[in-house]
Design a protein with these regions (language model features):
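Membrane-embedded alpha-helical bundles of multi-pass transporters/translocases
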Residues: 1-233
Length: 233
């Protein structure tokens, strides 16, 4: 086998990818992350009709972006301190899940300050996975090489990029479809009760559920340990 190059048919490359359970976990997580982002794009409707202040969208964007940037800057140091990505990512998403649960509680309370604080906590918790995703994919590729003797680095990155586009597209389409199904009327000052309930589902409940699902996946994504075990064989 030519270990320095990737010369496989589409079918052979696909087989190599699906044989790596850790890579499949990453792909599913990536898809869920993109759907998560799409549901947060419903924020403008939630701010306008539930919180009655469309200008809050910018404030909530800052509550996501600033903690995310801080977390990304800290990720390399935290990976080193925690002895790898597995524990850091898992604990980060546990924090993220707790944050999103609090966002749901705060949303029904109508407490904007608590919603903002909880949103920031969730974003901070999710940031390590965003920061080390490429390193995770590289580790997955190393695992495939150690178990099959074949390199699939480029194929893995390409499929992950494709997954990002698919996940974002699915999330946006589903969110838009559900909003329309609930009876949303563009430009109306007041929306129906069904539409208001759907806004709560899309902006509060769905992000929470998606975050919890990713957390469950991350519990098994210890590809670093698997690589070490393969090298010791």
């Amino acid at each position: 086998a030519q270990t320095g190059e990737e010369k496989y048919s589409l079918g052979a490359a696909f087989k190599l990818l699906v044989q790596n359970k850790y890579y499949l976990m990453i792909v599913v997580s990536y898809l869920l992350m993109q759907i998560y982002s799409a549901t947060l794009n419903m924020g403008i409707y939630f701010m306008s009709y539930v919180l009655k202040n469309a200008n809050l969208l910018g404030v909530f964007s800052w509550a996501i972006n600033i903690p995310m940037i801080v977390g990304l800057l800290m990720t390399p140091m935290l990976v080193q301190k925690w002895g790898g990505m597995f524990r850091l990512n898992k604990m980060g998403y546990i924090i993220g899940s707790l944050g999103r649960i609090l966002v749901v509680v705060a949303g029904y309370m109508g407490s904007v300050p608590l919603m903002l604080a909880s949103t920031a906590i969730a974003a901070l918790g999710m940031s390590p996975l965003q920061g080390n995703m490429n390193a995770l994919i590289a580790t997955c590729s190393e695992y495939t090489y150690l178990t099959t003797g074949k390199r699939v680095d480029g194929t893995m990155y390409s499929c992950t990029s494709f997954g990002t586009k698919v996940g974002g597209g699915i999330g946006t389409a589903v969110a838009g479809w559900l909003l329309a199904l609930s009876g949303y009327v563009g430009g109306a000052e007041v929306q129906s009760a069904a539409c208001m309930n759907m806004l709560h589902i899309l902006y509060l409940w769905m992000p929470m559920v998606l975050t919890i699902l990713i957390t469950l996946i991350l519990r098994g994504l210890n590809v670093e340990k698997a690589v070490v075990e393969q090298k010791e064989k």
